Each structure stands twice: as C-alpha cells, then as structure tokens.
Design a protein with these regions (language model features):
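Alpha/beta enzyme core
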Residues: 2-453, 467, 509-534
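Substrate-binding cleft of secreted/luminal carbohydrate-active enzymes
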Residues: 437-471, 477-513
Length: 534
C-alpha cells in the first residue's frame, strides 16, 4: 500500500503538470479518495486475496494450528459486520475469510423467492452477491480511513504531532478478505461453468468451490437424492474454472473440489472405459451390478456391460439412474479427492453426514498417502444437530469405557432424549461442549482441515434475532425490547452500527461534498443530527 505522504506528493506533481485542468483539485483530498478506493476492480481483489490464501496455506503446512475460518454471509452488510467484528475483537483480519453459500443465494437472494438448494436460482445472483459483499467491505475501509483523516485534520488544528496518525493510515489493514464462493455444480456444462466462473472472478472471487453432482439434479449436500457425475465430467469443469482464472490474469486463483460421494448413492452415467484401470473403469467398479448367466435374463432395452471378465447388468432405477454398491462411499471419496488434486484442484471439500474428527481424519489419511499436502475446507454445517451429535458421542464413549451412564437416556431408545434442557448442566453435556469448542482445532490438527466455515450462520442469526425482538416488541416489552436487547448492547459494545448514518456513508459523503463544493456544501452531519447523542 502506497504511503500517505508519497501519494499526496504524486497528486501535487500531477496537478502541477496539468495546470488549470486540475485547478480546483486539492492533492491531499485526491490522495485520500485514492486510499479509500484501494481496489479498482474485482480482478484486483481476486489477485490480492488469492495471494493471501496461498500464504495462509503455506503457514498451515508449517503448523496446523494456523487454520483459517469464515462465516457464510447472505448480504454485503452481514459480511461487512462480520469482518468489522473480527478486526475489532481479534485486532486483525488475518486468517478470516467470507463464505458465499449457494444455499443462501437460493434461499434468500433469488428473484423467484425462497428456493431449495437445487441450483434453481438465477446464476447471476452469485457474482452479484460477490460484488455486493466487496462493495460493503470497501465501504468499511472508506469509513474507517475517513475517521483517521478527520483525526489528522484535528491534530493539525491543535498543533499536535500528526506522525502517529499518518503511521496508522500507512499501516491500515483493509477489510477486503478472501471469499470462498459456491458455484454449485457449475450451472450447466463446462462452458457454462467457465462463463459463470469468469463473472465470479471479475466480481472479486479468488476461490471457487465446485461439487461433483449432476448440475440439473443438484441437491443440498445434507439431503437425499444426490447424483454424482463421472470424473471426466467433473474434471472438465475444474479445468474450465482454471482457464477462467488464467484468462483474467489471476494466476494464483484457487479451486475447491467438493465431493458428495460419501452420501451419494446414484450416478447418471456409466462412463466409457478405454483401457483396464483407467479412471472410467475405476468409477464403474463401484456400480451395483447383477451378473448375467444367460442372455435370456436380459429384457428389451436392458443395458449390460463386461466387468472383470463377466457380463453384468448395472442396477438401474425407474428414472434411469444407476446405483452404486452400498459401503463404497469411503473409497469413492478417496478416488474423487486424489483425482481432483491431480487435475488442478487446490483444496478439497468432503461433505459428511456428521461432525466427527476421526471419520474425516481416516479419509484424509488415505488421500495423503498419495498427496501428503492435501488440505480440506470443511463445512461446520448448521444441518448437523451439534448438541445432539456430541452428546451422543460422549454417551457412547462413556458407555464403551464402562462409565456410569444410568442417569442419561439411551440415544438408541430415545433418539432426542439427550437434547432435553435438564441435561445442559450435566457432566456429559459439559464434556460434549468442550468437544464442540475444540472441534475446529482438533480437526485442523488431526484431519488436515485448513479452512473451517459455517455455511448458514447469518441466516439462523437473522431468524433468531428477529424472533427475539418481535416476541418482546409485539408483546409486553414494547419499545424496551429494542432498547434493552439491541440499542443498549450496541452502545456498550461501541459498535459502529449505533451511528448508523455514519456507517451508511454519511460522514464520507459530507467530506466529499466539502472537497467538491467547499463552504457551499450542504452537510448532513452538522448541528441537528441526532447521531450526536451517541
């Protein structure tokens, strides 16, 4: 980042060289506006943030405690508040990203209204949200820098030392952080994937996540009916994304290859194998088949293939989809991941049915036999009942070790019994909560997870917060519900949102008006503004 005084000097030289053309321009004001708009394009952002991610991956390889995190955000404002909070409480945005969830785009950002996570939303909603998020993050930069500029002006008026403030400006840490953006299954064929990836990169995405499901039959990873595609189809889309990065000059752009094979039991195609042991034959080896001992067993339009020297008929459903053998999910995941890493993916995503460190670690161990530096992005999904999952885990561990568990309901007999609020302060629940608190650290250390994300936290946070407010406001508390539960807490936490006019850009706008109009500027933040009360 260019130094403040150097940039002011550059604009002074520019003004001198242009004569009357820049006669009304104050070089220092121009320098300030330039600093407030550090990133001119989304591609600039993608280049900058991709370098950050690669550096973070290198740090993780040296020490797995250096894992990274993100929260899924469905609006630019939620992303802005997340990054501002990280910067406020952690004193840095280092190792903190934004996640863009296809589920939340479908559920909250489609012009069709709320949709399930089945790639039914308009594909342009994805790059539009990326652009919106970075617009809000850049606005957070502009606001914070503006307050530093005002402090600098005040120091000059008082005749105090301005060096410390200029140093803060020069060392300003941007709110622009990497985005991991969900492209679902690519929204069509490989050309469609390439075109959408370009739009996402142009909006600022440095990391694109793609899954190995059939695009037109895509399902949420935590629902039934998932259909995977042969490796050749999936790898062509990884290749398409890589070409999009290279075309736009983002050489360090990242691809997360997600496999849903652990929970997917169906495939749409039987790929063509050209020689024994190739990737198609290995994929087909997982098919559920029935040996044909006599050709009379085949009916009209049945399909039969030769497999390991035998004639077999792949088991096919009424809808024409083929089934995999039960119990093959683990091995299919391993093959998916190894193949993806060998074909251009930077990171892996294994969608699991529960948050279990050992289960994830067992798969990563197999992958690392071939690719020792393999790293995962992991979905700490709200689709998991975390409370129940970890209480059951502790219950089972205690049961196996012979510990007395007689005071707790057996999950096999009472599936949701351990969720009862009466167990919240029990020793079992305390132990489960410790495991939940340690989950990300343990998984990073033991299971190769470089990045932990929560897909839908701001969806649930909005739902809960609105319910709590509405319950009190429309109930007996009236206005106190808002004042006590929101405004008073904002004030005492010293949140920027308390002064919502300033956060929305009023202060920046007033300063710009003064740059443009001088003493004739009509300002919004002068006397009479209620924001002075905060």
């Amino acid at each position: 980042m260019v130094k403040y005084k150097e940039l002011v000097a550059e604009f002074k030289n520019l003004k001198n060289s242009k004569g009357s053309l820049l006669g009304g321009v104050d070089p220092e004001h121009a320098a300030r506006m330039k600093l407030q708009n550090r990133f001119s394009t989304g591609v600039d952002i993608a280049k900058y943030t991709s370098d950050i991610m690669h550096a973070d991956m290198g740090a993780y390889d040296q020490d797995p405690s250096n894992y990274t995190q993100s929260l899924g955000c469905w609006h630019g404002f939620s992303a802005q508040q997340m990054v501002m909070a990280v910067k406020k409480y952690q004193k840095t945005t280092s190792k903190s990203y934004v996640y863009l969830s296809g589920w939340m785009v479908a559920g909250l950002r489609s012009e069709f209204g709320p949709l399930p996570d089945q790639s039914m939303h308009e594909k342009t909603a994805v790059p539009n949200l990326i652009n919106e998020i970075y617009t809000f993050l850049k606005q957070a930069d502009a606001r914070e820098l503006q307050h530093l500029f005002l402090s600098l002006d005040e120091a000059r008026e008082k005749g105090t030392n301005e060096d410390e403030i200029i140093q803060q400006i020069d060392n300003f840490e941007t709110h622009v952080v990497p985005i991991i953006a969900d492209i679902d299954a690519g929204f069509g064929n490989e050309e469609a994937t390439y075109l959408l990836a370009k739009k996402m990169i142009e909006a600022g995405a440095c990391c694109i996540q793609i899954e190995n499901q059939v695009s037109d039959a895509k399902q949420c990873g935590h629902q039934a009916g998932k259909v995977t595609v042969p490796h050749e189809d999936f790898l062509s889309k990884i290749n398409a994304i890589r070409y999009a990065y290279l075309e736009l000059g983002v050489e360090n752009g990242l691809i997360v290859a997600r496999t849903d094979s652990l929970g997917a039991g169906l495939t749409q195609k039987v790929p063509v194998s050209k020689e024994p042991g190739d990737i198609a034959s290995r994929y087909n080896d997982f098919l559920e088949t029935k040996e044909i001992e006599d050709l009379s067993e085949l009916t009209q339009y049945d399909i039969a293939i030769q497999q390991n020297g035998k004639l077999v008929k792949p088991v096919r459903l009424e809808n024409g989809l083929y089934t995999f053998r039960e119990g093959t999910g683990f091995d299919r995941v391993i093959l998916d991941c190894i193949t993806s890493l060998e074909s251009g993916a930077d990171l892996l995503w294994i969608e699991t049915e529960r948050p279990n460190v050992k289960q994830i670690a067992d798969m990563v161990k197999e992958i690392r036999k071939v690719h020792p530096q393999a790293k995962l992005v992991y979905n700490n999904s709200p689709s998991f009942n975390w409370t129940l999952a970890f209480r059951e885990q502790v219950f089972n561990e205690w049961s196996e070790s012979g510990k007395d568990i007689s005071e707790y309901p057996d999950p096999k007999k009472e599936p949701k019994g351990l969720m009862d609020e009466k167990f919240d302060k029990s020793e079992l629940s305390k132990e489960a909560d410790k495991l939940i608190q340690r989950f990300q650290k343990d998984a990073a250390n033991q299971a190769g997870i470089f990045h932990h994300l929560i897909t839908l936290p701001t969806y649930h946070d909005t739902a809960l917060g609105t319910h709590v407010l509405a319950e009190g406001y429309f109930g007996d508390k009236g206005m106190l519900a808002y004042v006590k539960e929101i405004q008073r807490k904002e004030i005492r936490r010293d949140l920027a949102s308390v002064k919502h006019q300033d956060l929305a850009g009023s202060t920046v706008g007033d300063e710009h008006k003064e740059y443009f109009s001088g003493d004739n500027a009509l300002l919004a933040g002068g006397k009479g503004s209620t924001m002075d009360r905060f």
